[in-house]
Amino acid sequence: AHRNWCELVRIAADSGVRFATLHGRTRAQLYVGPAVHPDVSDAPIPIIANGDIATAQDAQNMENLGYAGVMVGRAILGRPWVLGQIAGRNCVPKNVGEIVLKHLQYAIEYYGASVAVPMFRKHAAWYSSGLPNSSEFRIRVNQITDADALHDAISEFWGCGSQNIGL
């Protein structure tokens, strides 16, 4: 991204493009190593930064480098409130477990339990990432096929939502 962005943005602007998104990693890097975000203050069109933007401070750093905005990707997996924090709102959840349970409820309402339960395993893993005993929790969740059992596992892990969802 940092190798030829300036020339590509100039060509795009000359062709009528009104803004562009710049990812801070090259294709060869994949997800390895930190994203590199060049200063784009002199770009002829607004540039949106993408890659390794996980906090409000990361977004502020991009603004300081001349970016018109940010595009958040993997950082919101298991932490959807990050978007509010980047927007300047104090939205740290009091109980992540309640958010996970609400997310599970919405998934079941939308997809039905037979689809939602296996699909939700990855979400439970993202929400629990980095927490004590999360490895054991993920192993347990990946064996669950029943909505109430999944609800109970989430409730137990986060210490919330003692009532099952009745499915």
Regions found by a protein language model. Name each.
Residues H37-V40:
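Short, intrinsically disordered, charge-balanced linker/junction segments flanking boundaries
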Residues L22-V32:
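Glycine-rich, proline-tolerant flexible connector loops at the mouths of alpha/beta enzymes
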Residues N4-F19, D42-A49, I53-L167:
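Alpha/beta catalytic cores of nucleotide-metabolism and tRNA/nucleoside-modifying enzymes
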